[in-house]
UniProtKB/Swiss-Prot annotation:
Function, as annotated: Plays a central role in chromosome condensation, segregation and cell cycle progression. Functions as a homodimer, which is essential for chromosome partition. Involved in negative DNA supercoiling in vivo, and by this means organize and compact chromosomes. May achieve or facilitate chromosome segregation by condensation DNA from both sides of a centrally located replisome during cell division.
Record-linked SUPFAM superfamilies: P-loop containing nucleoside triphosphate hydrolases
HAMAP family: MukB
UniProt remark on domains: The hinge domain, which separates the large intramolecular coiled coil regions, allows the homodimerization, forming a V-shaped homodimer.
GO cellular component: cytoplasm; nucleoid
The keyword rRNA-binding appears for this protein: no
Organism this protein belongs to: Haemophilus ducreyi (strain 35000HP / ATCC 700724)
Gene Ontology biological process terms from the UniProt entry: cell division; chromosome condensation; chromosome segregation; DNA replication
Official protein name in the record: Chromosome partition protein MukB
Amino acid sequence: MMNTNELFDQTAVNSSQDKPLNPPFAVAQPANIARGKFRSLTLINWNGFFARTFDFDELVTTLSGGNGAGKSTTMAGFVTALIPDLTLLNFRNTTEAGSTSSSRDKGLYGKLKAGVCYAVLETVNSRAQRIITGVRLQQIAGRDKKVDIRPFSLQNVPMADSVISLFTEQVANKARVLSLNDLKEKFEETAVTFKPYHSITDYHSFMFDLGILPKRLRSSSDRNKFYKLIEASLYGGISSVITKSLRDYLLPENSGVRQAFQDMEAALRENRMTLEAIKVTQSDRDMFKHLITEATQYVSADYMRNANERRGNVVSALAQRRTWYDTKAKLLVEEQRLIEFSREVADINLTEQSLESEYNVANDHLNLVMNALRHQEKIIRYQDEVDALNEKLEQQQIALEEVSEQVEDAQAHTDEIDDRVDGLRSQIADYQQALDAQQTRALQYQQAITALQKAQQLCALPHLDLDNLKDYQTEFEAQAQDITDHVFELEQRLSISDMTKTQFEKAYQLVCKVSGEIDRSQAWSEATQLLATFPDQKMQAAQAVALRQKLADLEQRLHQQQKVQRLIAEFNQQAAKKLTDFTALENHFEQQQIKLEDLEAELANVIELRSVHRQQQEQLTQQYNQLAKTAPAWHTARSVLTRLEEQCAEQFENSQAIMHCMQEMLRKEREATLERDELARTEAALASQISQLSQADGAEDIRLNQLAERLGGVLLSELYDDVSLQDAPYFSALYGEARHAIVVRDLTSVKAQLEKLTDCPNDLYLIEGDPTAFDDTVFSAEELYDSVIVKVSNRQWRYSKFPEVPLFGRAAREKHLITLKTERDDIAEQHAESAFNVQKYQRLHQHLSQFVGTHLNIAFQPDPEMLMQEIALERQEIEGQLNQAVENEHYLRQQADHLKAELQMLNKILPLANTLADETVMERFEECREQLQSAEENELFVRQFGQYLTQLAPIATSLQTDPSKFEQLEHDYQQAKSTQRILQQKVFALSDVMQRRLHFNYSEENQCEGSALTEQLRTDLALAQQEREQARQRLRQAQAQFTQYNQVLISLRSAYDAKYQMLQELMQEIDDLGVRGDSAAEECARLRRDELQQQLSQQRARKGYLDKQLGIIEAEIDNLNRLLRKTERDYQTQRELVVQAKASWCLVQKLSRNSDVEKRLNRRELAYQSAEELRSISDKALGALRTAVADNEYLRDSLRASEDSRKPENKVAFFIAVYQHLRERIRQDIIRTDDPIDAIEQMEIELSRLINELTSREKKLAISAESVANILRKTIQREQNRILQLNQGLQNIAFGQVKGVRLVVNIRDTHSILLNALSDQHEQHKDLFESQKLSFSEALAMLYKRVNPHIELGQRMPQTIGEELLDYRNYLDLEVETLRGADGWMRAESSALSTGEAIGTGMSILLMVVQSWEEESRRMRAKDILPCRLLFLDEAARLDAMSINTLFELCERLDMQLLIAAPENISPEHGTTYKLVRKILANQEYVHVVGLKGFGQQMNKST
């Protein structure tokens, strides 16, 4: 933020920065500074110019040549090196005709050759530094015809090195163009500084700093202005682009003033926003305090209630568990008593269950025996049927085999006859085909040969022929006879073996049924062994019934003995003894009776001690309750005391420390108040000094500005406002007290006005002089080392030393202002801190006073909770002793009950102790059980396999010989028959050959002999067919008989399988029953069942009597069980509550500790209130909170979620949310803490201080409408004077009929009305400028609309319009006028001027712009540098000779360079002229250049 004086100071600074230094005012500018000049332009690898340097004349350089000679290319290279921005470059004379837009390459692509190209400018600045700047250009392949441009610069290049040699190197007899990387490597180790630029802004900044450009081109907008100026210069005429925006070109932007106003408005806006925020904070302070107080009450009350409930639940759970354990102990005692009474019932139940199970077993056994008897009858019946079917099956099998053999014989005989019939048929067919004798003989011969080959093949005799045929036939017939005899023998043996096979198979099957599958060779030995052991097994099976009766008797006796042993073992286990005999048991019984009497006496003493402990417990409880009543007040006092200790950063041990701290706070408050007042005075003094130094014209007294305006003069400080910081001490000492003088043109004219002045300084200095051409020749002065001697007159000298802190000139004032503002900011910060300390000490003293009046008498008492803890420990110790007494009582009672139980058990054991004498019962029982097990196994074996062994005995001898050889015999028989068949075939083949023996010697026979043979064959065929039919009939009969026998066999086999399967199932069932099925077993089982039934009836009668006696005891046990379940259920329920509360409490603790709010919630003073009281506090706070957070959705939702009593952690989350909400809402620039409670405390301290400070600051920041009008008018006046001075340089310009050019600047009528309203009528518009809702810019816009109601502002925002109205350029209209002929001064327009006149007028305007830019940028450039001035002019032939001379004269007078292009030499006697001619040599195009130095210039110099 800044005050009004700071606004004017900033305004003056910025306006003075923008104010150009006119030559008459340039006090510190040396006269011998040479202007920078462009020395040459070098084009490398351009179209027509491989390496060409154009040296520029100091004034005018002319490029002469015909169309296409390269003039435009040369100028394009210059412009490209000057402004390497492809977005701006556009060379018109190479664009497409009739196109609405320029070509893609902007006219640059076609001017370059492939490869690396350079456009380089060589410049010598005012410091005589040689500077080389340029661009590297390179065509980019593609249809877009783009060009890549990279700017660079070279410094410290020796004057002797040519530019071309820098960018090329010689390779043999050719030159190579170097790339940028090559250039960098070339100059890397030399003194030459090579620097490429990646930004056009950096490139232009370099050129501006070294005096190549007249203006710093900071942005693309500045580059656009400069390019438009160059373009207008290049193509000549009056550029509409420039004339329409002359204000942008000639009037500097007074951004400092506008920015100052914007900063001021921002400061005012921020100040007002801060005030509003303070008011909102002040209004919300009570709400914040109310919110945090109610939230603390709401959450802490529930927090402490949950803590108390959790503690109560834990105590209740422990009590429930104690009750549960007590009930369980009582139940154990009652159950122990029940055990003694119920053991007898248990024994009876056990006996009854045993008898009942035995009775059920006996009944089931009887049923099994009867079922087995019925199964045995079925087995016998099915066994007979199976045997009969088996015999029939064997007989049918034998008959079937015989019929099968008959079928096979008939089939073989039929096949043989079929073969013979087929052979006869083939012979007949052959004989019929051979009708003549030769054919018949040949056929017979062939058949004979075939028969011989068949015999050779069949008999395996390859050497068989007619000679040995008879021998072989005889031999094979003998073999056939032998094999026939052998077959007959085998048939006889096979029929005999078939009879023995049936008996062996039956005996073998019986053995397998008894012993399982065994080898056939072992069947005889297995059968012998089974038949040998079978009589003994039958005898042992008969003894099973007697053994069962004996085993039952032994089992009953063994059970009685085991019962006594079990009772003794149980007694020994309970009593931890090892008593086994009757004497030891009797002695132990007497000892236990004596011990029981002693325990009863000790129990009486323990009961008396328990009553004493209970009295002491009641006394301690009363003391504890008394302390609990005083604890809340003590905790409240200690909480307040802790808060005070944190605020005071001290520890209070007693009440004297509190009183001492109060006195200390009073002392600190007085000291801080004195310091605050002193800093306020220092800050005010610095602000006043800054305000004086911030005046726009350097006047220490604001009245001087009004006087200067009234007297029509200018303040001397304003004339010297641009003096440098180095010259400031000299001029300050030179003028002394007169440095605040007013410079007027005529003192005599001012003298009359002096007498009328009423409000002016005591000493007013007036100096006569021209304000537009004032210098320091008023005084005769002599400068010494650090002082100056001023000769006021011949008799009066003034000696003045240079001031240590000069204040003459804007630069000196700005430097001192920086120091003063820094000091003022430090003082302001210290003042704010002191004011805060004053408020803090006041608040601390107030809090201490309240504490003394409320809590001092109780805060330093001993901690009640510590005393309560001591009492609790003592009470806990007494409770432990009381519990110990109760436990001792319970233990003694248990011991007594235990002794009683032991005595009761001994009463049951002693009558039965004599049964322990018999020690052989167990051995006899095991022996009898083993005998019975063996007898039952034999009985089962006999029952299952006795019938099989009975059938096996008669035929067992057949197992001695194995009929399996029958199969081998049958195999030999089949093999012999096969051999017989083969031999018969061989014999038949040899017989056939023997019959055809004559055919081998066959000769021709007559026809009748062939016919007789055919008839013989047909007769044989008919006989063979008849025999074949008979054989087939016999085969069909045999097959029908075989089918019939086979069906009978299948039916017999199915019946056998069904009967046998049923037999096996019955045998399996009787095996599963495991009993013997005979009449003796049935009678024995029936007797056993009746006996057990009688015993069971006696036991049940006894049991009914005992159950009536146990009813009372069981009812008591049930009552105790119900009580135990109830207490256990209550304990589990209470424990679940504790566990759930613990989980929730842990989450609450975690949230509160992680968020550092536990100390806020753990209010110990609330721990002593009841749950209803705490709930009431929480409910009241909840109602208040609902109203407080009704407008905050987040807090409202959090509060609603916290109302769930099942989740207390939500309340802590709500408290944390409130903390976070307050932490975010409280201004961190005002409050110096993150804790909302501490922030509210600091807010109380800070609010009043900030309100006073910001209110006073707003008064300082208030912007005066009259001051704004004065600033705008002064700025407008200064710029008007500058434009008038620029017009002086255009007085002698003449082009054709144009005899003069000037700039006319006027104030717009609407804006003039606005200025008048601001300065003279500001009282009428207070409603705008004093409104808190409008900024100054908005108020200014509203005033503009009010005083100009006829103007339509459109939809623009008032803020935007107001910002434009703060720019003085919008108040001015700037036009160019020309003096032409009889028309006088008229507005310069191209339509009213000839081409030459327009070119000259446009050039004059451009010169004014360039000069204006130089003056505007003078303060941003070094003082020893004057920038280069160069303009272009293409097609200059349109100017006449007088206009050309005018241009040359203008260039000479303004020290400017001009580059002209024309088809002809327009003025060869002036400047330097280059003749350009484009030629083609050896298919290479190049531009021939001839330079001519102006001879007229040389003659003038010589003369």
